[in-house]
Amino acid sequence: WPQILRQARRKKALLLFGDEASFAQWGSLSYTWAPKGQPPEVSTSGKRKGYTIFGLIDYFTGQFFYKSHTGRFNSESYAAFLLDVLSQTQQHLIVIQDGARYHTSKAMQVFFETHKGRLTIEQLPAYSPDFNPIEHLWKKVKKEAPQLKYFPDFPDLQAEVNRALLHFAQTPSEITVLMARDCEKLGRVVKAA
């Protein structure tokens, strides 16, 4: 981590933590309070459609890039998202990602090689979502948008999630607050190195 941070500062790069999230039409379950003997109920039709989002957040500024996707995540859709981010930025991008198959596929290796002039990829250790600050953003969006709600119409779910995502895209300071604990831990690692 200290070397990645130094490299990002030296290149004046965006240091982006990436991940994907899925938002279910039937809502997200959570703990809640209710009077004894009166458990809360959320209506559902059994529809199992989900709304998926690719996301990247910048370690330094909280800038948030995202793209919705209605199909399954795959190398092609991930490459399209990264191309969108490359087209929106001028800086070098250092992307820290998990080991999802479509992140590490042969097609993505070719993509990364093709764009190595502006794109550096770093892998998170296996099974370590706790090292990825964007997880806090997904948790917050799920709590604000679909939690304990059922959306009879898929466009209603999309609108609710998009509203929450747009809010965070317009207020990067809120993202830096969400990331603060992780960034503080990462900063301590840098100072100790």
Features from the language model and the residues they span:
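Extended, low-complexity cationic-aromatic segments
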Residues: 1-83, 182, 186-192
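RNase H-like DDE/DDD metal-dependent nuclease/strand-transfer catalytic core used by mobile genetic elements
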Residues: 26, 75-123
